[in-house]
């Protein structure tokens, strides 16, 4: 039997190598519980603790996040504490909005420190400075940059001023968030940990996903979506079927945070009615049954715009940085992105060719630049 031993050893080694190689290359099952959060932001004017409790009771079995977006509630430390206690005790994660520091009668830094000790990982972080990019694009009274001679100057000034607002709390809380509908790239250059792309009106959801997700990827950050008004008057919010489709789109596109913006209080639960709660529950059930759908729409294509090009990308004649008119590239950029939406849906990202682009372009199978023809 001895002469056969070397041959047997060779066979065993070969089989072992095959098993090892196969295990390394065999497709791994998707994460059974991908880390993502879905919930409602209660932002009614003069929200009280009873409003918070009512909404928590309504959605706690099919959400895992609650956002306190009513600044009046946060002005009062007692009502804020009562609200957060109730949210936490019902198993939901917490995000709160803080606004102008001079409106608070208590030390907000101290409150954040205590909240993190008290709620642990149940406190996700702070929502700080709403829509900085959107304000720059369309709100003259709130623009950080009122005058600039070049796109480069506007980009630098915008980022510098916004960073000061974000950094006010950067040492007091683990995560800082905002929601926006433009200029994501430059907001991510500050210390925001995640930005929620707004699904608003009839604006292309895929376009905003491409801009927000692309910026997050380039800066090593997270991203999310927030579903806001469809109409400027009642009923304000989209119908239940549209909500379900938006929730599904955000989930398959890989949004870590998915939030429903709820304002004003035109009914017992704000702008939300039974059809919206039914859609939210249906979505929750879908995520539990289909965790493999999370992030299943991959961004395999990238579209790269010039550095510092703060084009709003909401229409072909949108402004640049809110202070410059559209230029010779604007219509082409709009048409290019629209063509990519038609062809790839949410399967592409928008990037900018500055120092933060780096090797991120290597993640994509195909990269188009602004000066190329897209067929």
Kindly label every feature range from the protein language model:
Residues 1-16, 20-25:
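N-terminal Sec-pathway targeting helices
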Residues 5, 23-375:
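Glycan-processing catalytic domains of CAZymes
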């Amino acid at each position: 039997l001895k002469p056969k031993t070397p041959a047997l050893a060779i066979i065993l080694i070969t089989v072992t190598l095959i098993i090892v190689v196969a295990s390394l290359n065999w497709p791994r099952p998707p994460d059974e519980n991908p880390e993502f959060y879905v919930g409602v932001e209660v932002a009614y004017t003069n929200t009280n603790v009873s409003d918070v409790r009512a909404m928590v009771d309504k959605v706690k079995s099919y959400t895992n996040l609650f956002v306190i977006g009513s600044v009046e509630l946060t002005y009062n430390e007692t009502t804020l504490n009562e609200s957060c206690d109730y949210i936490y005790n019902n198993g939901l994660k917490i995000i709160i909005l803080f606004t102008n520091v001079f409106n608070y009668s208590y030390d907000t830094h101290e409150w954040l420190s205590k909240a993190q000790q008290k709620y642990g990982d149940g406190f996700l972080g702070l929502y700080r400075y709403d829509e900085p990019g959107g304000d720059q694009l369309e709100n003259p009274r709130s623009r950080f940059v009122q005058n600039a001679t070049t796109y480069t100057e506007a980009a630098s000034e915008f980022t510098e001023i916004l960073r000061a607002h974000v950094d006010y709390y950067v040492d007091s809380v683990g995560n800082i968030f905002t929601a926006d509908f433009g200029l994501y790239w430059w907001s991510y250059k500050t210390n925001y940990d995640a930005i929620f792309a707004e699904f608003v009106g009839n604006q292309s959801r895929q376009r905003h996903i491409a801009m927000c997700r692309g910026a997050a990827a380039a800066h090593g950050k997270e991203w999310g979506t927030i579903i806001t008004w469809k109409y400027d008057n009642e009923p304000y919010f989209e119908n239940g079927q549209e909500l379900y489709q938006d929730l599904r789109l955000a989930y398959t596109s890989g949004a870590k945070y998915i939030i429903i913006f709820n304002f004003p209080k035109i009914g017992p639960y704000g702008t939300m009615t039974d059809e919206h709660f039914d859609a939210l529950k249906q979505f929750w059930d879908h995520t539990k049954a289909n965790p493999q759908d999370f992030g299943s729409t991959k961004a395999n294509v990238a579209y790269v715009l010039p550095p510092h090009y703060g084009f709003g990308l909401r229409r072909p004649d949108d402004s640049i940085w809110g202070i410059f008119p559209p230029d010779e590239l604007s219509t082409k950029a709009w048409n290019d992105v629209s063509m990519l939406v038609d062809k790839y849906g949410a399967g592409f990202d928008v990037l900018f060719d500055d120092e933060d682009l780096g090797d991120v372009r290597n993640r994509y199978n195909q990269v188009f630049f602004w000066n190329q023809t897209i067929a």
